[in-house]
Amino acid sequence: MNEETQTSELTNTDQGPQIEPGPISKWLNQKGLIHKLLEPDEIGIENLGVDPQQLFKIVSELKMNGFNYLQCQGGYDEGPGLSLVCFYHLMEMKDFNEGDKPREVRLKVFLDRNGSLRVPSLYKLFRGCDWQERETYDMFGINFDGHPHPKRLLMPEDWRGWPLRKDYIQPDFYEMQDAY
């Protein structure tokens, strides 16, 4: 499989502007790891789309290649009827010389809101994602397979629905139970 074939398996069929693969995308291609090129952000950080089945393997490879810090994990809703997105911002943390910039990459897993909202937990790789994954579950309903504490973090355990989804309808009334 060549570089074009690997990245094109997850690309959209629209004919928008051609996105050039960055160094991290090229490295993943050399490793045979399939991903989708997304437009870099305004400061040039690579954004890559990843299948849920490939996420753990790709992040494991990145961690072994120096991306040893999960700066942020979260989720967002693209809108009613559109995808729910689980994202990861990985960085390389080391001793830098003056003027050096850390390597950074963002991975995004696009999930059909009416399909399986399951991604593998990265807790085994980055223990700091414990509460971040729980918050993403609590607010968007994305399940993290293999997470050691898969329960709500912010909302009461008996809360119905996912408050940060754009199609969420807030209940008129919710009775809080005493914690005593």
From Swiss-Prot:
What Gene Ontology terms describe what this protein does at the molecular function level? Answer: NADH dehydrogenase (ubiquinone) activity; quinone binding
Q: Enumerate the InterPro entries for this protein.
A: NADH_DH_suC, NADH_quin_OxRdtase_su_C/D-like, NADH_UbQ_OxRdtase_30kDa_su, NADH_UbQ_OxRdtase_CS
Q: Which reaction does it catalyse?
A: a plastoquinone + NADH + (n+1) H(+)(in) = a plastoquinol + NAD(+) + n H(+)(out); a plastoquinone + NADPH + (n+1) H(+)(in) = a plastoquinol + NADP(+) + n H(+)(out)
Q: Does the keyword Magnesium apply?
A: no
Cite the residue spans of the region called Disordered: 1-23
Give the gene symbol. ndhJ
Subunit-structure text: NDH-1 can be composed of about 15 different subunits; different subcomplexes with different compositions have been identified which probably have different functions.
Q: Which UniProt keywords apply?
A: Membrane, NAD, NADP, Plastoquinone, Quinone, Thylakoid, Translocase, Transport
Compartments, record wording: Cellular thylakoid membrane
The protein's role, per its UniProt record: NDH-1 shuttles electrons from an unknown electron donor, via FMN and iron-sulfur (Fe-S) centers, to quinones in the respiratory and/or the photosynthetic chain. The immediate electron acceptor for the enzyme in this species is believed to be plastoquinone. Couples the redox reaction to proton translocation, and thus conserves the redox energy in a proton gradient. Cyanobacterial NDH-1 also plays a role in inorganic carbon-concentration.
GO CC, alphabetical: plasma membrane-derived thylakoid membrane
Which membrane topology describes this protein? Peripheral membrane protein
Q: Where is the composition biased (Polar residues)?
A: 1-16
- What processes does the entry annotate via GO biological process terms? photosynthesis, light reaction
Q: Sorted alphabetically, which PANTHER family does this protein's record hold?
A: NADH DEHYDROGENASE [UBIQUINONE] IRON-SULFUR PROTEIN 3, MITOCHONDRIAL, NADH DEHYDROGENASE UBIQUINONE IRON-SULFUR PROTEIN 3
**Which HAMAP family does this chain map to?**
NDH1_NuoC
Q: What is its EC number?
A: 7.1.1.-
Return the protein name.
NAD(P)H-quinone oxidoreductase subunit J
The family this protein is said to belong to: Belongs to the complex I 30 kDa subunit family.
